[in-house]
């Protein structure tokens, strides 16, 4: 994170998370190592964001992001 950039306080799966101002959902998921993974879904403030919109979906102070990863098991 750029030391001169403002930071946002958001929540990711109900846990506080600090993020650089101007961040997008894609940037957050990249930081979490999930941007290129299959089987990932994300919602911001209760609204599902289609994968095609991750790059353009800006995040704001106090946004609540829910990240879901599909898993297989047997």
Model-derived segments and their meaning:
Residues 1-73:
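Ubiquitin-like/PB1-type beta-grasp interaction modules and other compact soluble beta-rich domains
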